[in-house]
């Protein structure tokens, strides 16, 4: 053994080829500080051996290296620029040491080689992947750029255009796609991986392969004619801006770094990367996106723990077909859990099956599935007009019309047919779970399971704990949601649960602006372009449906009359009463037609303005700051109330609920990250300016105390 540490082992194989194996404790290899220090020491030990002729890098895990240890980032990035620069330079010195070894090097890649893992393989002369390998530089998804030489080496290995696409999108690349562009030199079967890598090194030692020329290319400026370079970088900037926009600076910074470094050798090029990396690491966007990554890991970790308490879910049922039931059935069946789809009407069953078939056909058309897989998934969905097939289900999801009496009746009925230990969940967006439980004989085996529409696209599921829901029930539904490929958060029962409870104060702020003559299209523009929502409030209400919004608003007003009760009609009432229901009937705040691709197309409709003018008088202009304040303050305060009341367990879960359930702008990180970035004291001062507008704008005592102590919701 040449070198051994808890994360890396180096041994000498036959023919004086050394093997460096990444094999950290735990399930995966990460590039944390310990591994980086071990790699540095291992390379020093290797350099001291006079007989080594080549080096192969391998992994003792099912995957190569998944990337840096992102849990270290927020603390590290809070350091002074000088400290951060020192860390980046020290890390890069290790990668340079690997690249500069006086003999050929190769990486044997299996599973993920992402971020720092990808930058490791780029520092070697040869890269051999097995068929399971996925390679990529996902750093821009965290608001930063590669910091261990990725922006320097990748363009010199696969060309500027390919490298810019890889880096700016942050997408993982399959082994065969990496081979096409030259990121890897060969793709082999998993069992042949190490042998193939060693053979390539033997050929290099025997001078059958010119490893020195390959290495020199990475150390030199990019070989790109001036005109071609100008066209390449100009095109990349245009494409990046159209996708990333102004709120996500990292992809554009990556293009600029590759462009500026194109004429430089390795040393100067790396300095350009270092400076851009440090600048981005200090941004609020990086803090927000890294926070989302960590919160996602936290939420998924909680779901994994819940799985230990969960009852196994081998079969399921959904009551109520149609679009929602069909979506739930598709999601369950496509992830491997057979499901019965029960309805009282054959046309509804047909609609549900057609919905599932449509989603599957789209996957086949995109090459993401095959007709055989599609048939298998459809065979996992059993349509039924009677309850009999439901009796074997481990979990039954009720998804009938959003009406308390109808739901209560269906829940009481199905309970008579299911097994003693079956779990029943209601897919409701607003109705109290504890109220619905009153119709059931076993309320402890009942909870809420709120899917978001469209089911196949929206990652969040709210699992609602009723007054009597048992821990096994909650754990089992959380585990089932995870098995369906969803991100579950557990919330306690209250009107609107968590997501809708915090959404409707936002709509109330919007209604308040319209009541004073605000222009809904102008408000949408500010909330989309400046704040960063995927849809402004008017457009979102049209998509949700003004009838749905009208009903949910009434539920919220009844549940929280002091804050959400209202006197007189608001804009939602005006649209609803004039049968303007949104996209579903072609007219809401906007008018809708169908474009050439069959998608809804929105247009300004003068009728909407006439109706609002008749109700609220002449239009009045509001500036962007006021629009943002008056819509967002109510949502933020209500989110804080949910945390204080224990409706949601942590800032992390609240923020993930907002990002995954509502599309809260990821670059802002969620309400609690946004509050911490803004400063709680600054927010309280802003809210106080609008406190005269009512309870939705009045901060809680706990918020005021936190502000006075200069506190924050996250501990950095």
Curated annotation (Swiss-Prot):
Protein keywords: Fatty acid metabolism, Isomerase, Lipid degradation, Lipid metabolism, Lyase, Multifunctional enzyme, NAD, Oxidoreductase
Residues involved in NAD(+) binding: 324, 343, 400-402, 407, 429, 453
CDD domains linked to this entry: crotonase-like
GO biological process per UniProt: fatty acid beta-oxidation
Residue numbers marked as site, Important for catalytic activity: 119, 139
Record keyword DNA repair present: no
One annotated Gene Ontology cellular component of this protein: fatty acid beta-oxidation multienzyme complex
Region listing for 3-hydroxyacyl-CoA dehydrogenase, in residue ranges: 311-716
Metabolic or biological pathway: Lipid metabolism; fatty acid beta-oxidation
Binding of substrate, residues: 296, 500, 660
Presence of keyword Phosphoprotein: no
PANTHER family named among the record's database cross-references: TRIFUNCTIONAL ENZYME SUBUNIT ALPHA, TRIFUNCTIONAL ENZYME SUBUNIT ALPHA, MITOCHONDRIAL
NCBIfam families in alphabetical order: FadB, PRK11730.1
Protein name per its UniProtKB record: Fatty acid oxidation complex subunit alpha
Species of origin: Shewanella oneidensis (strain ATCC 700550 / JCM 31522 / CIP 106686 / LMG 19005 / NCIMB 14063 / MR-1)
Lineage: Bacteria, Pseudomonadati, Pseudomonadota, Gammaproteobacteria, Alteromonadales
């Amino acid at each position: 053994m040449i070198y051994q540490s808890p994360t890396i082992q180096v041994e000498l194989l036959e023919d004086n080829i050394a093997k460096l194996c990444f094999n950290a404790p735990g399930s995966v290899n990460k590039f944390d500080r310990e591994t980086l220090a071990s790699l540095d020491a291992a390379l020093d030990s290797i350099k001291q051996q006079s007989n080594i002729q080549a080096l192969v890098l391998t992994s003792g895990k099912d995957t190569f290296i998944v990337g840096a240890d992102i849990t270290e980032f927020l603390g590290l990035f809070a350091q002074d620029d000088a400290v951060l620069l020192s860390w980046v330079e020290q890390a890069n010195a290790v990668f340079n040491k690997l690249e500069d070894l006086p003999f050929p090097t190769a990486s044997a890649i299996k599973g993920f080689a992402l971020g720092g893992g990808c930058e490791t393989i780029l520092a070697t002369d040869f890269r051999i992947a097995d068929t399971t390998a996925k390679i990529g530089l996902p750093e821009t998804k965290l608001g930063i750029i590669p910091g261990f030489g990725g922006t320097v080496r990748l363009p010199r290995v696969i060309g500027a255009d390919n490298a810019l696409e890889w880096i700016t999108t942050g997408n993982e690349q399959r082994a065969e796609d990496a081979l096409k562009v030259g990121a890897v030199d060969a793709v082999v079967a998993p069992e042949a991986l190490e042998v193939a890598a060693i053979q390539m090194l033997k050929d290099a030692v025997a001078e059958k392969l010119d490893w020195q020329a390959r290495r020199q290319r990475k150390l030199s400026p990019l070989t790109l004619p001036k005109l071609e370079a100008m066209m390449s970088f100009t095109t990349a900037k245009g494409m990046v801006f159209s996708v990333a926009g102004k709120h996500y600076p990292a992809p554009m910074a990556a293009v600029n770094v590759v462009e500026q470094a194109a004429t430089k050798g390795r040393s100067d090029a790396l300095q350009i990367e270092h400076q851009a990396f440090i600048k981005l690491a200090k941004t609020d966007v990086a803090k927000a996106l890294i926070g989302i990554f960590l919160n996602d890991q936290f939420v998924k970790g909680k779901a994994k723990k819940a799985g230990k308490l969960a009852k196994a879910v081998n079969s399921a049922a959904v009551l109520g077909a149609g679009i929602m039931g069909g979506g739930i059935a598709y999601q369950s069946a496509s992830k491997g859990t057979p499901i019965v789809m029960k309805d009282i009407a054959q046309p509804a069953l047909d609609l549900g099956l057609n919905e599932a078939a449509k989603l599957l056909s789209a996957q086949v058309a995109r090459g993401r599935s095959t007709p055989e897989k599609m048939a298998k998934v459809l065979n996992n969905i059993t349509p039924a007009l009677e309850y009999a097939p439901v009796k074997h289900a481990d979990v039954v999801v009720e998804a009938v019309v959003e009406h308390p009496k109808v739901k209560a009746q269906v829940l009481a009925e199905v309970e008579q047919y299911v097994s003693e230990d079956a779990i029943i969940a209601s897919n409701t967006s607003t109705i109290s779970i504890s109220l619905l439980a009153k119709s059931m004989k076993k309320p402890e085996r009942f909870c809420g399971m709120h899917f978001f529409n469209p089911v196949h696209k929206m990652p969040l599921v709210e699992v609602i704990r009723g007054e009597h829901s048992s821990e096994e029930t909650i754990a089992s539904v959380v585990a089932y949601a995870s098995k369906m490929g969803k991100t579950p958060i557990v919330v306690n029962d209250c009107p609107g649960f968590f997501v809708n409870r915090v959404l409707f104060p936002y709509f109330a702020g919007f209604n308040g602006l319209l009541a004073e003559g605000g222009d809904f299209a102008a408000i949408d523009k500010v909330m989309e372009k400046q704040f960063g929502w995927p849809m402004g409030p008017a457009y979102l209400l049209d998509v949700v449906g003004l009838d749905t919004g009208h009903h949910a608003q009434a539920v919220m007003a009844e549940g929280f009359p002091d804050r959400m009760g209202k006197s007189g009609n608001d804009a939602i009432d005006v649209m609803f009463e004039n049968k303007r229901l949104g996209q579903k009937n072609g007219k809401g705040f906007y008018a809708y037609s169908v474009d050439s691709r069959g998608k809804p197309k929105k247009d300004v409709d003068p009728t909407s303005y006439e109706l609002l003018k008749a109700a609220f008088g002449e239009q009045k202009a509001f500036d962007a700051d006021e629009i943002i304040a008056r819509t967002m303050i109510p949502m933020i305060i209500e989110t804080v109330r949910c945390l204080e009341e224990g409706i949601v367990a942590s800032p992390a879960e609240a923020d993930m609920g907002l990002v995954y359930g509502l599309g809260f702008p990821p670059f802002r990180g969620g309400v609690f990250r946004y509050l911490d970035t803004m400063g709680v004291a600054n927010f309280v001062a802003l809210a106080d300016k609008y406190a005269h507008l009512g309870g939705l704008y009045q901060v809680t005592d706990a918020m005021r105390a936190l502000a006075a102590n200069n506190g924050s919701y996250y501990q950095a």
